[in-house]
Amino acid sequence: MLTLKSSYIKHKTNIYSFLKKAAAITGAVVITACSFSACTPLDGSASRYNNADEQYNAADNESFNAFTDSLFRELASSDSLSLHALLENPSEYGIDDYDITLGRIDIDNIDDTSDITDYITKLNAFDKASLSKSQQITYDLLNKYLYTTLNYSDLYLLNTDLTPTIGIQIQLPLLFSEYTFMEKKDVKEYIQLLSDVDGYFNNLLEFEALRSVRGYTLSDDLLDEVISSCKSIADSAGDAEGMFIGTFNSRVDDLIFLTDDEKNVYKKQNEDAVINHVIPGYNALITTLASFKGTNQYSGGICNYPDGARYFEGLLENCLGWSKSIDEYNDLLDSYIRSYAIVMQKLLRKDPSLNSQFGTFSFGIDKPDQIIEDLKKKITDDYPALSDVNYNINYVSEALNDYASPAMYFMPQIDNLDINSIYINSTGTDSSDLYPTLAHEGYPGHLYQTQYFASTSPSLIRNVIKPGGYIEGWASYVEVHSYEYAGDNTLLNSLVQCNYALILCLYAKGDIGVNYYGWTEAQLSSFLTDYGFNSAEAAHEMYTAFIANPANYCKYVLGFLGFEELKKQAQKDLGDNFSLKEFHRYILETGPVHIDILFDYLKNWENRLVVSSRAA
């Protein structure tokens, strides 16, 4: 049997079945990227800006800068964990007064949208023509983001932060593990935040109670998965060598600005916070979520809930911002599935020996550091240069292995760019999967994109409003193209690449099918069988994953196809003047925006490229 398993693919597929049906199916596309971005100069110099005043050019409208900076300060200070993830020194950005809290949902005013309408009024007061080019892009981004948020604000009860794999109960320990200690204040605030875990979870449970009354609680099997992850964390949180106590102690031991006595005091305070707040918080989740079992009234995809189809549309509009209906997305996926299938068939006709080589395909490297360095060398022809960046590769705690995503990238603080962390889940990622995984998370994926855009000194607000379709679409786009950097057998590389890209498209089809068209598990299984994949267990896992996180797979895959469609348009417009490296530079310098915005500004970039090529 010929098989392929990639970094976000759990199940294997038979290539012969694929040839019979002109398709294949496996896998999953579940990854999270946490935190936000910062800046490095394009020329590789060592300069860094230290406050907001250094970021803007003379062509900017200063009033608009003041508005967006004010919005940034308000959003960034909504909770201290996010604030610290964004800024090491908030006071240098005008943020001096903030509560040390993980944040709260205002249950009593949960449907109040006055803040959004106020932002819209202030934004619309600006004449877009008076803004610089970069400000106009920011204007369009904010306009789309705010109106989309407002238009779907009545559907808040359909959302939950407590889900398998990407739920906050899993992400919170990882966020704490990446909390930087640069001064004594950081250690104190960390312990204060740790002491707020139970209060934070109790607030989330108040919100979940509202969902339960409406019958919106997760299905019992999904609740069991969330509860299981909470139990694993609660059971290990108090371990002397665990992620909350052992990791903290070793980090504190390395802090040269603390005396030995201070280290011992903080270690004791941290342990007390874990015992008295973290573990009780997770136990509260376990007990209360268990009490919600049996209250779900709507089985299947989100479209089966009241206004669920509209909610799914809103999820895609928010993360993609692409002027397409769900039917058009579905048709787009069909066209790419056909295209990839045709290419694969042609490759196998051209070289039938690819059949036997397919199952043994390998990048030839399985050490993370070596893979990153190999990618940095091989991407130079296709992607613009970036100065060297520090990074760390870590492994997810054993307690989270069965629940966390295959890999994650934690973005650096705006004013402390040198801490870039990639986490690998050793359970969810085999060594053979590491190359495309690190292309996704590292070069030329999240790490590279984050640092490159930061080098353009973007407006502060661009660090907190970043459409997921761009972020994850870019990482998926470069992950697919990383197969071009394998061995010298370009035909085999293309075969494996097309197989993986096709798999992603089928996964997005399943997401739409279940969550918008209302496919049952049996219908999903039938769909997979049509493409030569007959595992009932895999179909069940996929169906459950689609229900747990509506539109999550579409965010990755349709974002990826958005860049492919943008590239097709640029190639059509430019002909021989098209440059892949310059096309990537356009995407990277524009930064995280909705796909429509990338298309809107494409012609301006094309005109500049033609002029510069003629001048050369």
Predicted features along the sequence, with ranges:
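Bacterial N-terminal signal peptides that target proteins for export
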Residues: 7-26
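Short, glycine/alanine-rich hydrophobic alpha-helices that insert into or span membranes
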Residues: 28-32
